[in-house]
Amino acid sequence: MKAVSGKELARLLERRGWQLLRINGSHHIYGKAGSVVRLSVPIHGDQPLKIGLLRHLLKMADLSEDDLE
């Protein structure tokens, strides 16, 4: 799996219709109309997200690893 930073994941989510609801410290909280799911994306500069967290966020957002490319 490709290493992805929180910033890159946030851009992907916004392109897929997710909206930034609020910022709590370094965590950006995203939501989507018609969905109760909320995603907390840590934005720590260009530091890559850990694989387990990235997989979890992709699953919750109904995205696949192929969407990262």
Sequence positions of predicted segments:
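N-terminal first-folded block
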Residues: 1-24, 29
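Active-site beta-strand termini and strand-to-loop segments that position acidic
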Residues: 30-34
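Short, charged/polar, Gly/Pro-enriched secondary-structure boundary elements
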Residues: 35-39
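C-terminal structural segments of small proteins and small subunits
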Residues: 45-69
